[in-house]
Amino acid sequence: MLVRKLIKEEKPDAILIFTDPRYWAWLFDMEREIRTKIPIFYLNIWDDYPSPLYNRGYYRSVDLLMAISKQTKNINELVLGDYAKDKVIEYVPHGINEDFFFPIDENYEAFDKFKDFKKDLFKGKEIDFVVFWNSRNIHRKRPADVILSYRMFCDMIGEEKAKKCALIMHTQPSDNNGTDLHAVKEAFCDPSYVNVFFSAEPLQTAQMNLLYNVADVTMLISSNEGWGLSLTESMMAGKMILLNVTGGMQDQARFEDDNGKWIDFDANFPSNHRATFKKCGEWAAAVFPSNLSIAGSPPTPYIYDDRCSPEDVAAALKWVYELGPEERERRGLKGREWVLSEESNMSAKNMASRVIECCDKAFENFTPRPSYDLIETGPRPVNYVKHKLIDYTYSYE
């Protein structure tokens, strides 16, 4: 009733929604009534393949699908099939404000305070190399694997060097949706040389920028990840990233084909999680999944769980460590340059411009739905995933 009243009294031009479609099931139930008057725009993302055919009804219920990742755009098109021709489907990646997240150097007006912040963070310890993880403590984010892989990295470089390294985890250390990270730390980490610090309090944006600048690399090794905002924020702060190649994280690594073109996806090449292409942006340390298995639940019956091995993550951390501070800084600034570029469109300004363009296009394309349809009934069509699940092939343009 509230939506009906809002449309009648306020007369909006459109309804814009975002996040998981299951949050909007109640709205999709009345989509015909709404779309006889105004369009529905959806800024959407989906974590992984196989294409979620169980989302088809949701995607059909909107007029504009703004896909946050390249993978999501492909999923929207694959799931909709012939219905896609009636939609506006565009790639609109997340954008970060470069005035909020930026590199801090000696010219920063509060550089002395930044040095004090870093000193307090490590409780007086002399730390030369910092790994940062900023995410929720939930199973798909693999927080325990983060600690295990960091411990393995420390063993790879030796105890004396490891004493001057640190892992910072900005998260709730104990969460029923994840695990008890204090217990994981105690079990895996010898405190004499493995330094793991937790940042559990909510922080303002300016404080988060300080944390990103303390780090040498930000890592995210989720087994399902629609985008991975901490990576984009880290890149905007001029820092390198380490990622599991899945979901929208692979967009941020900017994998390129043999012609140097930023890769795109289709039914024959739905993802790069099988390591079809390995060359990526200088700012990224990419770790490919060692295992792809199917997870699911009644509302979402199937989805790939793309897990990378802690050993591979540890090796990638060692590679970043051995680059040295000057090379890490150069590569991190290359990442910032790219997220600010017209190619990536990952700045807040570029994202806003893309949203405006897409909304304008959708308004031009919008045709109000009729009050009813006459549907000729027949046998239920076979419903199965038609894109490749193995042996991906890439089409060069």
Report each predicted region and the residues it spans:
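A charged, aromatic-enriched C-terminal amphipathic alpha-helix characteristic of glycosyltransferases
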Residues: 304-312, 325-357
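Nucleotide-activated donor-binding/catalytic signature segment of Leloir-type glycosyltransferases, i.e.
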Residues: 33, 178-206
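A short, active-site helix/loop in glycosyltransferases that binds the activated sugar's phosphate group
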Residues: 52-91, 96-108, 183
